[in-house]
């Protein structure tokens, strides 16, 4: 192993061992001493206790203990010994009750239920006692550490070195907890993961500074088969007057000559094409593609064409390869008269042409290296330029201080700067000043201070081994920035933090408003909302093309983007969080609007559009939600009902008992007639074991059954009229999406609480525990004053004790 590499490995391994030891500590110990008083207490004021404690215990005994007793323990819960007068004594059980009662799920329909005022009084009594105890002794919770996940790592590199990288080239897939990839308890460490960070540091430092000794390599970029190649589709980033193709960000390591090769796939009768190769929007070559025999030039259906050597200067550049448009105007695809995007790969038969598919772009080089031109990355790194050998080490020290402070998200102490200089010395001995700086940059990127978000505990808290404390302004800046932007703090935020001004009254709110107005706040939609709403699950469903020929991965991507833009608009315009469920508009391009039956939308650009009727509203009318809760060949009211209960309401049904047959085992026809999904479900629900949960889920899912597998509106299934009638668990009749929305809006508290809980967990990088529920309730109740504006929830999380404070976290002695 090389000496420098050994130092990297040794340093990171030592930190890794310390953090691994810390991971064995209890997740969130209750602090033994009360913390300093928070500037904005995150627990509600004490309310008036409803009725008497004896009355509340009588309600629990009459309506709950019959099932939730020591013998039956329905749902794993016994309330025989639970005292509603002192719910805070067993807050975990109390919170479980509140969640079910507030949603109206308990007592279950069909059995005796208390009067609405009695039901509400019980919920309020439980909340009041738990919230009162929490107000007397706040528990901000704790986490051991967080490390940068893939998106955060890529954003940090972009800010630090002005490079767009795909962190997935080096880092393994992020594990999720509570459906988020930034939750600390899922961010396990391993030697393989640490090695991945080291490999990333080595590669990225070389990309940023360049390499005068670069040797020719082949870099291959592959275009997914579903990417559109149709004559009417223009790919963003490609020149105007082109169609299809692909765009890649490629780092050219040095000034020199490069060869660009493209791989095309098509049938035997593909038409002649011209392929435009451009760098940063400037054409550098025009390649001619000619029809090939069946099987392609390489016998595997592929044709390879390449440019002559082209001189390119060092740095990251946008490389585009696209087909030149042959004509303008309407087209008709006779091969696949649907919305499929990929017509190449097979012969259309005599007299019919097919469209080729641009599969790969291969960049080869550099050849005949002539030097290194100035790049944005080099300009950022080299804040000084020594002219004498004696100036090299002082210059390296200046670079270490400046770059290190930005990478570590805090100022560096002198001894920390001094510890980076041996890496410069080692590299400079081998290759001069620039190699020394590159080696030092590699050390910075491999440092635990860059990879991990480590928060320092005050000495008095460590010595006392107990209590809670306010996090430093520097750590608070990182919490705020990674929450709202998904990336490190910018210069303004970091400057305030290093001067200890961020915690001044009103300052964090002022900064949060500034950051929410910044385009980078879109991370709340692409990162938070996308994970909360399980948008990644859309890719797990592949509607059967025999039944749904108009659906493809392009449309799936449009649906995901629709939901992201929709959520972002609510944040940006500071609308009510209830608009997530009741909005009468969405964002669509021409294809998605056509799929939904919305007229008057042309072009590939997304824009805000009004729904023409009330069949669609909010999230439950959007394709990304409807597709992910379907199966390949039919809708699934069960999955849709379960999704609403779990994701939106926070009351997931229990898993099915073992050995219970699935719905697909139920006969799909009867008397020579195909059964509808509802008819098969009714047969399935005759099993009492199944009915216990399906009576909650099924009416929700059936109310959405007018949306087919792809989210398209329909009136019939298997030739039979749809029957979507059902009874919501509060007794409301629901048979349409609009009636389901009305039923949900009658009791919006579970929806708002679950939204707050997910926002809270994402912001803090840890699961929301039972002791966090008073804070979550306080945020939700406070938001009511503004009609639940989105900013009220975001500011409520930011101002909470849980966000600004931390409980002491003991490390393991092992």
Residue ranges and their predicted role:
Residues 59-60, 64-67, 77-82, 94-97, ...:
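Long, contiguous hydrophobic alpha-helical segments, chiefly transmembrane helices and signal peptides
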Residues 2, 108, 813-814:
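Short, intrinsically disordered, low-complexity terminal/loop segments
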Residues 1-23:
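Sec-dependent N-terminal signal peptides
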Residues 236-242, 246-267, 272-281, 286, ...:
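Long, His/Glu/Asp-enriched segments that create or flank divalent metal/ion-associated functional microenvironments
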Residues 20-225, 236, 322-388, 397-422, ...:
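Aromatic- and Gly/Pro-enriched helix-to-coil junctions and flexible linker segments
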Residues 223-228, 233, 557:
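Active-site-proximal, well-structured secondary-structure segments within enzyme catalytic domains
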Residues 68, 317, 694:
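Histidine-centered active-site/metal-ligand motif
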Residues 231-318, 322-343, 382-440, 448:
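A conserved hydrophobic secondary-structure block that centers on an alpha-helix together
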